[in-house]
Amino acid sequence: ACGGGTGTTSNEQTTQNTEQTEQATEETAEPAAEATAKSPDNDLVVAMQADATHLDPHVSGNGVSNTVTNAMYESLVTFDADTNIVPMLAKEWSMSDDGLSYTFVLNEGITFHDGEPFNAEAVIANWERGRSDQSLRIYTQTQSWVSAVADSEYQLTITLDEPNNTFLNKLTQVRIISPKAIEEWGQDGLAKQSAGTGPYILSERVDGGYTKMVRNENYWREGPKVD
């Protein structure tokens, strides 16, 4: 977890700008007993050179925005340390002989931060959001999709307009949001609350200041080491 600009707070992860980190350094005269009780070894404070411009992963943002949202949201596939495409929310996939269709088998038992289930319909709802609003970053990322169809609760097929060898690369950037949150919260709400499947949940956000996240206790993979 991470502390804010006035000290160390347990069970939270904070992304702060450099100015606030310097302020925190000056204010470290917290009582030793309190610091010990709050298990500071499990806290992480990260100083960034700029503030995140948006916390909705479908909205264009700066590099800091991507770094922050990556802790809260996940994609069907991702890159490993050697830049190979590997499974994430999807546990396996296959491509048709003509290169136009990709079928994904999804991991089961995953829930979004708002308690909603992750499934094929959730992926489709994210695509539909993108194609209905060209101002969103996800629109560009999914522009080549002709259709996305749920073959079952945990399997879907995405069909492209033409074979595209960058499709999976782009898919690593398509972060999946809870459809209920998309509908009920919109961009303004997603700037204040997170609704992804990632290891951290948005706890507090101060524009131009800091972002606090807490560990997702219901995370579907091995839990994060930092609170």
Which functions belong to the PLM regions below?
Residues 91-135, 157:
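Aromatic- and charge-enriched surface segment that lines or borders ligand/interaction sites
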Residues 47-97, 128, 195-196:
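N-terminal lobe/hinge region of extracytoplasmic solute-binding protein
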Residues 41-50, 91, 101-104, 123-126, ...:
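Short, well-ordered beta-strand elements
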Residues 20-45:
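N-terminal low-complexity, Pro/Thr/Ser-rich intrinsically disordered segments
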Residues 140-182, 204-206:
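Surface-exposed binding/hinge segments that line
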Residues 80, 171-226:
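Gly/Pro-rich hinge or "lid" segments in bacterial periplasmic/extracellular proteins
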Residues 2-11:
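Bacterial lipoprotein signal-peptidase II cleavage site
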Residues 52-59, 83-86, 113, 166-169, ...:
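Short, solvent-exposed loop/turn elements at domain surfaces
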